């Protein structure tokens, strides 16, 4: 199911990929890759609040994975670019600092 969602994403079928990933998370709400992929897709479609929520969930599920916090920083940066809301600048910096402090 996840592989199919990735294929849809790669083919630019964002809506279909989102629908499939949401279904996957209904089955397995702890599937971190689905949360990270939804964060990317929601960012691409300008749904920054949803992107942030899914990236935060990935960080909660795998709090020792620095990649998740690096991705969180990027999600915040793109939220700032898409909305102009300055609060996202500090949040992006904080997430990146956290990722760097983990050293893995």
Region annotations inferred by a language model:
Residues 1-23, 27:
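Alpha-helical segment of the N-proximal tetratricopeptide repeat
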